[in-house]
UniProtKB/Swiss-Prot annotation:
The encoding gene: rpl2-A
Segments of skewed composition (Polar residues): 1-13
Domain of life: Eukaryota
Localization of this protein: Plastid, Chloroplast
Species assigned in the record: Buxus microphylla (Littleleaf boxwood)
Main location, first listed in the record: plastid
One of the record's GO molecular function terms: rRNA binding
Gene Ontology CC annotation, any one: mitochondrial large ribosomal subunit
Name of the protein in its database record: Large ribosomal subunit protein uL2cz/uL2cy
Cited Pfam families: Ribosomal_L2 (PF00181), Ribosomal_L2_C (PF03947)
Region described as Disordered: spans on this chain: 1-27, 222-272
Subunit structure: Part of the 50S ribosomal subunit.
Ribonucleoprotein keyword on record: yes
Membership in a protein family: Belongs to the universal ribosomal protein uL2 family.
Length: 272
């Protein structure tokens, strides 16, 4: 991490990653057309504060880890503009080259492997049934063979707390406790770049490069734009409770859909 000198207001307290480079392999990237910018098919804003941003090349990440029982070596640790975690380029013994999420503490030259009954070592991928209780894991499958879908953000880590019957009980980074099939795979260890959420960008322009627009309070808008808007001067919102721009209750109302198939698999809801 490189901290800028406090020479100008725009760079004061800013920080950038100086050690991690971005020089991806051509056969592991492809262009993507980012359309919508938070709009739906009618052109109406459905997700706020999105738009602009620098062009990106998508890196193909191996979330399935289906190179079974073939050892690979970490060749580079690279920056990925599509996620806040770093990625590693792996050279496998059979000549295959793939990107994976960078496990915390992994360095260039380390070896990894995936499969059944492989060592419980940082970066190795194996089924939950072969892991001891208390193992810290990330990149967890929900559906067998579909690839990791849980605990993939920077610093994310889940914990295997029980195994019974055909299911394993996991405590996820959100605090949720849920059941997953013991045959699903996961990667040992924690995702790297733990301090990603504590990094100071230093200026508004750096936020714009990430494709994030300014956040504006509803109370300073016009009535046509937000239910909180309008009034003379600094006026209250004029309602009993805060609402979203579309008039639905905000700040506390549960937004999860009812009667989902996974309701029976969640033993304890996530903590807020």
């Amino acid at each position: 991490m490189h901290l800028y000198k406090t020479s100008t207001p725009s760079t004061r307290n800013g920080a950038v990653d100086s050690q991690v480079k971005s020089n991806p392999r051509n056969n592991l990237i492809y262009g993507q057309h980012r359309c919508g910018k938070g709009r739906n098919a009618r052109g109406i804003i459905t997700a706020g504060h999105r738009g602009g941003g620098h062009k990106r090349l998508y890196r193909k990440i191996d979330f399935r880890r289906n190179e079974k029982n073939i050892y690979g070596r970490i060749v580079t640790i690279e920056y990925d503009p599509n996620r806040n975690a770093y990625i590693c380029l792996i050279h496998y013994g059979d000549g295959e080259k793939r990107y994976i999420l960078h496990p915390r503490g992994a360095i260039i030259g380390d070896t990894i492997v995936s499969g059944t009954e492989v060592p419980i070592k940082m970066g190795n991928a194996l089924p939950l049934t072969d892991m001891p209780l208390g193992t810290a894991i990330h990149n967890i499958e929900i559906t067998l063979g579909k690839g990791g879908q849980l605990a993939r953000a920077a610093g994310a880590v889940a914990k295997l707390i029980a195994k019974e019957g055909k299911s394993a009980t996991l405590k996820l980074p959100s605090g949720e406790v849920r059941l997953i099939s013991k045959n699903c795979s996961a990667t040992v260890g924690q995702v790297g770049n733990v301090g990603a959420n504590q990094k100071s960008l230093g200026r508004a322009g750096s936020k714009c490069w990430l494709g994030k627009r300014p956040v504006v309070r509803g109370v300073v808008m016009n009535p046509v734009d937000h239910p909180h808007g309008g009034g003379e001067g600094r006026a209250p919102i004029g309602r009993k409770k805060p609402t979203t721009p579309w008039g639905y209750p905000a700040l506390g109302r549960r937004s999860r859909k009812r009667n989902k198939y996974s309701d029976s698999l969640i033993l304890r809801r996530r903590s807020k």
